[in-house]
Regions:
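HTH-adjacent hinge/linker in prokaryotic transcriptional regulators
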Residues: 2-30, 34-36, 40-99, 103-104, ...
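Conserved phosphate- and dinucleotide-binding cores of soluble alpha/beta proteins
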Residues: 2-21, 26-32, 37, 52, ...
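Residues at secondary-structure transition points
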Residues: 67-68, 109, 163, 181
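Conserved SAM-binding loop
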Residues: 99, 121, 187
Length: 255
């Protein structure tokens, strides 16, 4: 195939990469750079995005097709996280300054941000930061720094809190290990200080959580209902539990 015949559109280019993977089983960054006549940085972003969506596995210098045995198309929990993340992304406007806390549900939000322009994103998660770097719209990335906590796989501590307090944000997107209907969001992690500061410096606090966690009381209270503005969950939320949350003055979105 000639370079001039290759698609410049991101969607078309990634489709062509997948076609090549189907035919060859693997591709190299060098091969794709020559084929599309674009930068290595752009190709690496393409491969990262395709890996994030479960289509391939990156390796040194290229990528291979995702082995069928590790593809789980019926992962209902993953689907729930995706629809919750999509609903959360719809609340984000161009040029917003947002915080994305660590966690698998909040991490799913990053994939939805590619069409947003001029975003500033603060995170305490290396995995979230890595996914942000793969976005073509290249949002401004800020990191809290601090002490690495192996349990939550995120930065915590006083340094991280001080960094956060030097900024202000439009929105915080945060997950939860459980939702106590009487008190608020709960977590296994005893280190809740950073979550408190994240909420303090954000004008809107959005909790993203799957419905099976609602009613589940973890040992540590993370955010009270008074600190939460919006809760986004899936349609598995019962009407009784929804009314209990609404009674705290929290907006509830079921998707």
């Amino acid at each position: 195939m000639k370079k001039s015949s290759q698609p410049r559109n991101t969607k078309q280019r990634r489709h062509t990469i997948m076609q090549l993977l189907q035919e060859q089983g693997e591709v190299s960054v060098e091969q794709l750079v020559q084929l599309f006549d674009i930068s290595e940085v752009t190709i690496r972003k393409d491969l990262s995005a395709l890996e994030t969506n479960g289509f391939l596995l990156r390796k040194y210098g290229g990528a291979i097709l995702m082995p069928k045995e590790i593809i789980d198309e019926n992962d209902e929990l993953t689907k729930r996280k995706f629809v919750i993340a999509k609903a959360a992304a719809e609340r984000i406007r161009d040029h917003n300054r947002i915080i994305v806390d660590s966690g698998s549900t909040t991490a799913a939000l990053i994939k939805q941000l590619n069409l947003k322009q001029g975003l500033v994103v603060m995170t305490n998660s290396l995995s979230v930061a890595t996914e942000l770097r793969a976005l073509e719209n290249e949002p401004t990335l800020l990191m809290t720094g601090g002490t690495w906590d192996t349990r939550s796989e995120s930065f915590q501590g006083k340094v991280a809190e001080q960094v956060l307090r030097s900024y202000d944000f439009d929105q915080l997107f945060i997950g939860a290990d459980g939702i106590d209907l009487a008190r608020g969001s709960t977590t296994f992690n005893e280190l809740v200080g950073l979550s408190q500061v994240m909420a303090e410096v954000s004008r809107e606090v959005v909790v993203m959580v799957e419905s099976q966690k609602i009613g589940r009381k973890m040992p540590n209270l993370e955010l009270t209902w008074q600190q939460i503005d919006v809760l986004i969950t899936d349609t598995g939320l019962s009407e009784q539990d929804k009314q209990a949350i609404l009674a705290h003055g929290v907006e509830v979105i079921c998707v």
